[in-house]
Amino acid sequence: MILTFLTIGRIVVNKMQDLPLCDLNEVKRTAKRTDSDISGCKFSGEYLESEDLSCLSFINCMFENCTFTDCDFERSSFVDVTFISCDLSNSSLDSSYLSRCEFRSCKLVGAEFKDCSIQGVAFESSNCGYAIFDKCKLSETQVKNSDMSSAELVSCNLKAFKTSGSKYLGTSFFRTALGGVDFSTCLVSGLRVSDTFRELRNAVFSANQAVELSMLLGIRIK
C-alpha cells in the first residue's frame, strides 16, 4: 500500500491526540527562561492576541482549535507540528523554519511567512488568502483544497511543489519559477507575474486554463 504525505500526516495526528494537554503561556515562559524546546505538547482552545511567541522551538506538537491573532512567531522553529482548525490570521512567522508540518482546516488570511524555510509541509482545506510567502524556500510542499487567492509568493524557490483542488485567484508568483507545477485541477485566474511571463514556463495547465492564460498573454483564441 502506498501512503501519501497527507495520509501519513493523519496517522501522525491520531498519535498526537494522546499528547498531554499543555498551557501555551506556561510552557512559553519556561522555554524562554531555560532556552529549551517545547516538545510533545498538545494545545487546545488557546486564544492569544498580539502575543510575542518569537524565537520558540516546537517539536512534535499539536495545535487544535486555537486562535492566534496578530501574534509574533518570527524566527521560530516547527518540526513535526500539526495545526487543526486554527486561526493564525495576520500573524507573522517570518524567518521561521517549518519541517514536516500540517495545516488542516486552518485560517491563515494575511499571515506572513516571509523568508521561511518550508520543507515537507501540507496545507489542506485551509484559507491562505492574502498570505505572504515572499522569498520562501518551499520543498516538497503540498497545497490541497485550499484558497491561495491574492496570496504573495514572490521570489520563492519551489522544489517538488504539488497542488490540487485549490484556488489561485489573483495570486502573485512574481519572480517565482513554476516549471513542473501542475495546476490542472485548480481554479486559476488573474495570476500576477512579470511582463515576460517567464514564471509560467513549463508549468502544467488544463485546456480551459490555457484559454484564461491566453488572455493574460494578450492572445485571442477563436
Describe these PLM feature segments.
Residues N14-K222:
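Tandem repeat scaffolds
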